[in-house]
A protein has these predicted regions:
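Catalytic core segments in nucleotide and nucleic-acid processing enzymes
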Residues: 1-54, 273-393
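Terminal, charged accessory segments of proteins
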Residues: 1-240, 256-274, 278
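Helix-loop junctions and short alpha-helical segments
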Residues: 249-256
Length: 393
């Protein structure tokens, strides 16, 4: 997995192969303009474009002194990052993409969303849709939520496999005589042929192994199977995986078995499609991440019932407003929040602070105009107002 950072100007020679046709060079530099993900078949790897908020304020470094070029190969063996930095980049990369993916699903017609046709989300609960990265997240989530299921399957698959089939062993194997007693060094157990249930498990664990080893997403997996790796797994990603899964599909009926099969099939269907193309055909990118950030915060704290007063009469727009208990008397009052898409260490400007005071004054005026309920906000005896907390995120 390759890591790029929004807003940073890279030397063209450093990232030209990574960016492909997604970014244009100017004066020998390529500036990353979007946040999100794409798979580049030229380098055979996923590329994550991170939000610029990890930039050190007032500097051209990131995460406390790293260069953007250091972070490009954060998950390679020659990386300059220590374990803590690498873990942060991994978690932040996945968090950023999940945020973008959720926004794109909820705002399919937004002009800031740029995605491939193959990455469209399906409304069917049974299907696995989105980009390759969405499929990978679905695989990891299924594994983490169903570890008891995997242990149960593995236990059942291997029960009885260590029992020796003495009739076949005596008929087909030559013993060694020791002190007049035959000793069979090579025995035949009761496993007669490929078990299709086990083949599905081998395929699934091989996918997890590939994700962990090649994409920089660490997944702690305990598995005793002989996994599909190297050139053989490459063949699976180029079409053999779909063929094998179609051959054993008839074996599965339970919901979890079918879900496991669908996840494996979706993975190989995605990889075979994007690797056979010469162009970048699997991507999900956002042109204005500050809008995504604001939407995410508002989904967490905003009050949908108050969305109508966000656009104020003086033309100003509140980012977040909600009702919550006053720390003074416990009555419900209004809280106003402002989302700031800043670099690490940046300070809030005087203009932003002034706007917050204006928002609070407008809230008071709305009470006079009858736009807001006055219960718990204005004291009927003194006609004084409870305070209006303002904060920045």
């Amino acid at each position: 997995m390759k890591i790029l950072i929004e807003g940073h100007s890279y030397q063209q020679s450093r990232v030209e192969d990574i960016c492909g046709d997604f970014e244009t060079a100017e004066n020998g530099c390529i500036k990353v303009s979007k946040v999100g993900y794409f798979f580049n078949p030229t380098i055979g790897d996923c590329v994550i474009c991170l939000p610029k908020v990890i930039k050190d304020h007032g500097k051209e470094t990131y995460l406390g002194g790293l260069s953007a070029e250091d972070i490009v190969d954060a998950f390679s063996s020659g990386s300059h990052l220590n374990d803590t930095q690498r873990e942060f980049v991994q978690n932040f990369s996945l968090w950023s993409y999940r945020t973008i993916s959720t926004f794109a699903r909820l705002n399919a017609d937004s002009s800031i969303v740029c995605r491939s046709e193959s990455s469209a989300f399906s409304n069917s609960e049974d299907s696995v849709s989105g980009t390759l990265l969405d499929v990978i997240f679905a695989i990891i989530e299924f594994y983490n939520r169903n570890k008891d299921y995997f242990m149960y399957i593995i236990k059942n698959l291997h029960s009885g496999y260590d029992r020796i089939n003495w009739r076949k062993t005596i008929s087909h194997k030559t013993p060694i005589l020791q002190d007049g007693s035959p000793i069979y060094v090579d025995v035949i157990n009761r496993k007669k042929q490929i078990n299709f249930d086990e083949e599905l498990m081998v395929i699934f664990y091989s996918i997890l192994n590939y994700i962990s080893g090649n994409l920089g997403i660490m997944i702690p997996v305990e598995c005793n199977y002989d996994l599909i790796t190297g050139a053989q797994f490459e063949a699976y990603m180029e079409g053999l995986g779909e063929t094998r899964l179609n051959a054993i599909k008839y074996k599965y009926f339970s919901d979890k078995d079918l879900k496991l099969w669908n996840l494996c099939y979706a993975f190989f269907h995605k990889t075979s499609g994007i690797q056979s193309s010469n162009d970048i055909s699997d991507f999900l990118l956002i042109g204005s991440f500050e809008i995504v950030f604001e939407s995410m915060i508002d989904a967490l704290i905003g009050d949908p019932d108050l969305s109508g007063i966000k656009s104020m009469d003086d033309g100003k727009i509140i980012d977040h407003i909600f009702r919550y208990h006053s720390p003074i008397d416990g009555k419900d009052i209004y809280y106003i929040g402002d989302s700031k898409y800043y670099a690490i260490g940046a300070e809030i400007g005087d203009g932003s602070i002034y706007k917050q005071f204006t928002y609070a004054k407008n809230i008071i005026q709305y009470h006079f105009n009858g736009k807001l309920e006055t219960s718990g906000y204005r004291d009927t005896l003194t006609e004084g107002y409870n305070f209006t907390p303002n904060f920045f995120i």
